[in-house]
């Protein structure tokens, strides 16, 4: 007989849970244990049918202040952390390590960590479901060790997170094995296609209507229509905002680099080093040497604060 487990909510000691976060549609879908089990089976090649085998752990903490985009759960004495991301970041392994530490702290809160008896903890597995608009491979592994500032022959601590691209057209085998992932990818793809022709509000409304008619996320969208529309608009606006911030940062960096380059050429010209200027234009390595030669003065130009940041 299968023993039913209660949902376990864990909090970091001394921390007030943040109840102002917004959830993503993806995570709202996986709050349904049946759908979460469907995703788990597809990823692991298993055939579990009892959703109560899952023991969901939720943790509200400062790492995710704006958007609730994760779900963690126990099954077969293993801890799984699923995270949804619409923007790629190489820093995800570190964020997951911090999150894992909080989860373990909650799980062992009543255990004697100074005692002689071994305190057992579930081994973790990390999966990132990516559906951003930046092109990424179907699957890739992100490692904590890639973030280390110093090289080591062997790493004393590492963490691997597998990132899966769940955009329409990616990971066809996974999509075939998991209906809920395919439906989510289809819904998201329609919103993005339609927003090219109309406002985000109209694009979401059209996608919701079509998906309900065609049986795509039908039950969820019927029951949570207003919430789904609000979340879709919020996710789109947040993704657009982050994309604009990256573009503005890139443009600011490009302008700073051009200022430094102009300053270098001006200094070379004052020293009558015209040949060095001509060579640097066609030789990136030589340009790098010159930038190092005039490093301090060029660096001051490159990091000149923008207006309002002084």
Residue ranges and their predicted role:
Residues 1-310:
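Elongated, amphipathic alpha-helical interaction scaffolds
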């Amino acid at each position: 007989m299968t023993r039913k487990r209660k949902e376990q909510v864990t909090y970091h000691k001394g921390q007030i849970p943040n109840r102002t976060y917004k959830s993503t549609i993806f995570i709202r879908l996986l709050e349904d244990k049946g759908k979460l089990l469907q995703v788990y089976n597809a990823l692991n090649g298993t055939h579990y049918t009892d959703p109560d085998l899952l023991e969901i752990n939720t943790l509200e903490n400062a790492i995710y202040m704006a958007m609730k985009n994760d779900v963690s759960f126990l099954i077969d004495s293993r801890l799984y952390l699923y995270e949804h991301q619409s923007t790629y970041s190489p820093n995800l392994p570190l964020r997951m390590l911090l999150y894992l530490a909080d989860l373990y702290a909650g799980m062992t809160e009543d255990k004697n960590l100074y005692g002689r008896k071994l305190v057992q903890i579930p081994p973790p597995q990390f999966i990132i479901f990516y559906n951003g608009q930046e092109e990424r491979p179907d699957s890739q592994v992100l490692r904590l060790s890639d973030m280390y500032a110093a090289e080591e022959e062997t790493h004393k601590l590492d963490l691997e997170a597998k990132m899966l691209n769940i955009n329409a057209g990616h990971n066809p085998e996974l999509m075939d094995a998991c209906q809920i992932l395919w439906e989510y990818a289809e819904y998201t793809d329609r919103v993005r296609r339609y927003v090219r022709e109309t406002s985000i509000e109209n694009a979401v409304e059209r996608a919701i209507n079509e998906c309900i008619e065609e049986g795509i996320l039908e039950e969820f969208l019927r029951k949570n229509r207003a919430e789904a529309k609000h979340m879709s608009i919020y996710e789109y606006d947040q993704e657009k905002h982050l994309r604009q911030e990256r573009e503005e940062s890139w443009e600011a960096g490009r302008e700073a680099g051009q200022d430094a380059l102009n300053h270098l050429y001006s200094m070379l010209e004052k020293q009558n080093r015209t040949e060095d200027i001509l060579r640097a234009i066609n030789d990136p390595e030589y340009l790098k040497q010159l930038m190092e030669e005039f490093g301090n003065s060029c660096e001051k130009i490159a990091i000149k604060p923008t207006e309002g940041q002084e």
